[in-house]
Structures are given as structure tokens and as C-alpha cells.
Amino acid sequence: DILAAFRVTPQPGVPPEEAGAAVAAESSTGTWTTVWTDGLTSLDRYKGRCYHIEPVLGEKDQYICYVAYPLDLFEEGSVTNMFTSIVGNVFGFKALRALRLEDLRIPTAYVKTFQGPPHGIQVERDKLNKYGRPLLGCTIKPKLGLSAKNYGRAVYECLRGGLDFTKDDENVNSQPFMRWRDXFLFCAEALYKAQCETGEIKGHYLNATAGTCEEMMKRAIFARELGVPIVMHDYLTGGFTANTTLAHYCRDNGLLLHIHRAMHAVIDRQKNHGMTFRVLAKALRMSGGDHIHAGTVVGKLEGERDITLGFVDLLRDDFIEKDRSRGIYFTQDWVSLPGVIPVASGGIHVXHMPALTEIFGDDAVLQFGGGTLGHPWGNAPGAVANRVALEACVKARNEGRDLAAEGNVIIREXSKWSPELAAACEVWKEIKFEFKAVDTLDPEK
């Protein structure tokens, strides 16, 4: 069975048992009345069952309801069908004030019907020939308004300065100021020039997201013809059907696939309604993607540390034990489905590098947009500053130093040998994003 943990807030007067049963029925075989055609099938075989209910500590009239769904309810290899059933009409149910899908346990038999990520972590490292450190990226800014030639210039400067990747922002598609084909050509020219000058393999996430699947595939095919290593997709706004289609193409044609999660906070930010990002992350690993944005803990975007590390492990590891202290409701076995590299991006700069290296480890992409292009000396010095900071943190970690305790000292030491890093530290030394997270863990029993 597929197991689901729902946070249920019933309407006043509705007992939790009735609410849990209603969720199970509405998201599987049930409807609002008994129908004659119930007798033409075996409902006991197909109906969802609410098998356990527990109150949420510290919350009045809020419960975690566990529901089991028979596997025969779902089409093989289709995240679209799985979500249509589990989070379809039930979220508008009048008997509930609010409903949130906290987690899913995907059985191994169902996991094996999915291709998953086109390549996975180890294959990506082998393609890039880069080991033993996080990868460095940069989102080109301003995100909208640059001409294709100026956009390509920024890509070149960042890659030449020492970054591994540059990135289209999520809303860069094919606008009047920069049509997609022009952007692809100038970005490809930039990364090949940077590769020749640095001797390193470089990449730029060319956003293939489009208004139709046919147009999306046309862009991905053109990227492959240019010989670039990676393309990008906005998987929530683009949709799971489009994403899975693109992931299959990327595996067949040797392209890495970077995934942006634009629109996720509409779905996952509120604690009592919607669904958590850990569910969206599991769905992405099934649908397919080699990278996905996963928050930073320390930057400008929402993300509590324990929650973030919980779904980072769900993305990367082959087997994850149940751990309610990190928001993980079920043990999950991925049966060798390739892992996904988490991307830390949003309001981060060189002073965050020790914390990011300590939190995410080696298998991550640390992506500095404003933290590269906002350098007072220009784009290339901004990239140099980030690369020096990263190399200093990795060296210090490998020497056994405590990045959490000595991070500022490590960055200051490195800045003595890098004027670019010293200038970056001076510009961003006072920049912090200290706000309480909205989505937090429940208190322990």
C-alpha cells in the first residue's frame, strides 16, 4: 500500500474518526452516497483505509490521520495519477477546515515503475569530473530584461571566474527582450569559451520550460544539438507529465536535468493546509530530476534546519528511516532509484559558505545569484570570491576544523590571500535574513 499522513483539522462537531474516514473515502473509491454500481466491484479491495489517528500536541482539534491506499488504485509510473487521487477533491471537503499532506510512504513495488532522475549524483560527478566538494552555481541577474548577448556575457564572466554552473532564472523562457534560441546560442558560446580558458567542464541551466510539451521538447532537442551538458525545467508550473517526459528524454540523450520548484510555497508553506515540500521532493525524485532547489536554512527563503535536512536526505539517500524529529513520518526505501542533488539558492553570500558547507556536505549545489553578480568589482571577481571561500571551507573541513564554530575565522583567513573575497566580505558583512519560519515541526511527545 501507499501510506499517507494527513494533518486534519475537522469542522466543529465533526469527530476525528469521521474526518479520517472521509479523507480515506474521498481520495479513493468513495462518494457522497451509496450507488448501485458499488455492487459491481469489490470495494474492500480498492478503498482507502484510515488505520490510525493521533492528536497533534499543542494544537486544539488537529490530528494526524494515517491512510493506506491499495496499490491497484494507481497507474504505474505516473506521479500525475498518484496526486490526482491522493490530493484531488478531498482538499475542498466541507467537513474539514483544513487538510495537509505531511508525508507519503511509496512502496518499493511502485517505486520500481519509475525511471526517476535521468542520471543521479555519481553519474553527474563523473560527467563533470568534479569530486570532493559542493558544486558552485549562480543565477544570472537581473532575471528579466537583459538581451541575449549581454546575458551570455554575464554567463561567461561567472564561469570564467570559477563557478561550475550558471542558471536561467525560473521565469526566463522566451520573452520579447530575449527569445529562447538566441539565449541558448549565446550561453553555449559563453560556456565553451570558459571551458577552453579554465580547463574545467562548465554548464548553464538552459530553461526548456514552455507553454506546450512540444515546444519544451523542441528547446531540449536544440540544447542537445548545441552539446551543452544540462537543461532546466520548472516542474510545478510545467506539470508532472511534462517533467517526466523531459526526464526520459534527458536520460536517453545524456543531458542533466536541473529542476526549479517555482510555485512550491503556494502549496507547502502553511502549516495546516496544502502539502509539505518533502512530499513534493519525493514526487520529483520519482518523476525525474538531477538537481532541485531545496532551500538554504541560512538565506532569504523559508526553511527550518531540521525540516530541510529531512528532505535533503530523502532526495540523496537510498534508504531513510522514520524520524519525526525531522518531519519524516515513514521509512522510505528507494531501491537504487538515483539520488537528486539539492540546490541551496536564495539570499546567500560568501559569509554563509561555512554554514552551507557544513549543512549540505559535498553532494549539493551552492548557488549565489546576487552573491556573485552583486560584487563591487564585477561578475568575474564575484565568482572568484565564492570559489576561494568554498575551497577554504572544504580545506578547513578536511583538516578537521569545525566550520560551525570557526566559519568566520576561516573566511577571514582566506580573504587575506584573495582581494576579491575581502571585498565581498566587506559588502555583505551586515546582510542577514533572521525571520522565524512559518512551517515548523510539532513538539515531541
UniProtKB/Swiss-Prot annotation:
Binding site for Mg(2+): 167, 169-170
Enzyme Commission number(s): 4.1.1.39
Binding site for substrate: 89, 139, 143, 261, 293, 345
SUPFAM superfamilies per record: RuBisCo, C-terminal domain, RuBisCO, large subunit, small (N-terminal) domain
Localization terms from the record: Plastid, Chloroplast
Gene3D superfamilies associated with the record: Ribulose bisphosphate carboxylase, large subunit, C-terminal domain, RuBisCO large subunit, N-terminal domain
Post-translational modification: The disulfide bond which can form in the large chain dimeric partners within the hexadecamer appears to be associated with oxidative stress and protein turnover.
GO molecular function, one term: ribulose-bisphosphate carboxylase activity
CDD domains (UniProt xref): RuBisCO_large_I (cd08212)
GO cellular component, one term: chloroplast
InterPro entries per the UniProt record, alphabetical: RuBisCO, RuBisCo_large_chain_AS, RuBisCO_lsu_C, RuBisCO_lsu_C_sf, RuBisCO_lsu_fd_N, RuBisCO_lsu_N_sf, RuBisCO_lsuI
Broad class of where this protein is predominantly found: plastid
Cofactor note: Binds 1 Mg(2+) ion per subunit.
Record PTM N6-carboxylysine, positions in chain: 167
Catalytic residues in the record: 141, 260
Broad enzyme group: lyase
Function: RuBisCO catalyzes two reactions: the carboxylation of D-ribulose 1,5-bisphosphate, the primary event in carbon dioxide fixation, as well as the oxidative fragmentation of the pentose substrate in the photorespiration process. Both reactions occur simultaneously and in competition at the same active site.
Family of this protein: Belongs to the RuBisCO large chain family. Type I subfamily.
Assembly: Heterohexadecamer of 8 large chains and 8 small chains; disulfide-linked. The disulfide link is formed within the large subunit homodimers.
Protein name, as recorded: Ribulose bisphosphate carboxylase large chain
Organism of derivation: Callicarpa dichotoma
